């Protein structure tokens, strides 16, 4: 073995005391005893080895918006937060809607990314090219481009489609985007899914009724996500600070509680990391940074008994890898040796000044939390230790099932 991690790790829902062997950047063995190896990382008591986490909803800006975020700063933020794979949303400026722009995006990622990555392609009346996933906006959000015919665009997709479900007709009628805007779009998306029968992923579900619609429909090829900001914040927080403007908006306490009630039925948690500078936020930009806080908030919730640590593994590693058909990611022998080592006892205060994102602020400023990512390993190499991102960018594009 080139590398052996020794200590407690999560496996099949249980905490195991043993070791994990790594060779050529891949996991070779999970063992109950201490494996032999050239290089060992001994994980102390109170610390646990998790798989590297996958965030299927990240806006990394760059291109003409390098003042908001770059692939370099955004992926540094990712590994700082224990995220080893990011899904790059294509509503950039310019948007990723043709082969040339997609290739430009890949070129930048190859040079600048500290995390592994999946490349998205935006559909809004254009023809698709091969990408890792497709994104459709049913109503205008950041970037302003949305699909006038969701079903037609979704039917064209060559792989799984992630959809921002807010009804464009209702947005013009209700610009503050009350629950009906999301609920109506989710119903339309589910109706299209029944007809088209292609994999569909509904982003950032925020309402009780929207979630009910998805769960009752129970369509095998439809998945969905919830975000930490919809789990931890409400409309009352937005009323105190207009910086918390986001699409879909923060909801009432009853919606937030319902998301927690149904968390066992939620397959994926994703950040929807959407950085803007404070100046842009003060001018009304919608979106919240989240890559460096999402895992910490969830670890704190684990410590408070709101969910299990295994839930974090399922919703941010196993399920994303399975649903998005990522061949080289997950938690098993032969998968990439990506790890997030967490200290469940570490108490700390969230401060934006300690983060890598260019956003320069966080919705959770001053929150005291218990639980922290202390080391991130990407394909067998340490990329973050004790808040410091280490080495050069070495991110690679994910491998999809069937793409050999």
From Swiss-Prot:
GO biological process, one term: 'de novo' UMP biosynthetic process
NCBIfam families: PRK04250.1, pyrC_multi
The protein's annotated pathway: Pyrimidine metabolism; UMP biosynthesis via de novo pathway; (S)-dihydroorotate from bicarbonate: step 3/3
Signal peptide as annotated in the record: none
Annotated Zn(2+) 1 binding sites: 57, 59, 135, 272
Name the UniProt record assigns to this protein: Dihydroorotase
Organism: Pyrococcus abyssi (strain GE5 / Orsay)
Binding site for substrate: 59-61, 91, 276, 286-287
Catalytic activity: (S)-dihydroorotate + H2O = N-carbamoyl-L-aspartate + H(+)
Keywords: Hydrolase, Metal-binding, Pyrimidine biosynthesis, Zinc
Pfam families: Amidohydro_1
PANTHER family tied to this protein: ALLANTOINASE
Active site: 272
């Amino acid at each position: 073995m080139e590398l052996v991690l020794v200590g407690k790790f999560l496996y099949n829902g249980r905490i195991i005391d043993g070791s994990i062997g790594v060779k050529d950047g891949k996991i070779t063995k999970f063992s109950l005893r201490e494996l032999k190896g050239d290089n060992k990382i001994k994980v102390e008591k109170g610390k646990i080895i998790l798989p590297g986490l996958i965030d299927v909803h990240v806006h990394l800006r760059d291109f003409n918006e390098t003042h908001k975020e770059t692939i370099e700063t955004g992926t540094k933020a990712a590994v700082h937060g224990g995220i080893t794979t990011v899904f790059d949303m294509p509503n950039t400026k310019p948007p990723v809607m043709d082969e040339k722009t997609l290739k430009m995006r890949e070129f930048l990622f190859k040079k600048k990314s500290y995390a592994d990555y999946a490349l998205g392609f935006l559909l809004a009346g254009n023809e698709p090219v091969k990408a890792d996933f497709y994104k459709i906006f049913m109503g205008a959000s950041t970037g302003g481009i949305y699909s006038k015919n969701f079903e037609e665009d979704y039917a064209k997709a060559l792989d799984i489609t992630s959809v921002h479900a807010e009804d464009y007709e209702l947005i013009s009628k209700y610009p503050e985007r009350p629950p009906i805007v999301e609920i109506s779009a989710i119903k339309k998306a589910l109706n299209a899914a029944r007809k088209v029968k292609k994999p569909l992923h509904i982003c950032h579900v925020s309402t009780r009724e929207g979630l009910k619609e998805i769960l009752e429909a129970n369509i095998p090829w439809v998945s969905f996500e919830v975000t930490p900001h919809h789990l931890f914040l409400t409309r009352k927080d937005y009323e105190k600070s207009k910086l918390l403007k986001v699409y879909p908006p923060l909801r009432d306490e009853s919606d937030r509680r319902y998301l927690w009630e149904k968390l066992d039925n939620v397959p994926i948690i994703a950040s929807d990391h959407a950085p803007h500078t404070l100046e842009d936020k003060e001018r009304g930009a919608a979106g919240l940074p989240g890559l460096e806080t999402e895992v910490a908030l969830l670890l704190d919730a684990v410590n408070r008994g709101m969910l299990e640590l295994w839930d974090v593994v399922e919703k941010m590693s196993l399920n994303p890898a399975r649903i998005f058909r990522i061949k080289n990611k997950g938690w098993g022998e032969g998968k990439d040796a990506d790890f997030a080592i967490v200290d469940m006892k570490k108490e700390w205060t969230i401060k934006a000044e300690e983060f890598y994102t260019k956003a320069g602020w966080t919705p959770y400023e001053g929150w005291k939390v218990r639980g922290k990512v202390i080391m991130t390993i990407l394909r067998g190499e340490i990329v973050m230790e004790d808040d410091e991102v280490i080495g050069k960018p070495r991110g690679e594009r994910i491998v999809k099932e069937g793409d050999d």
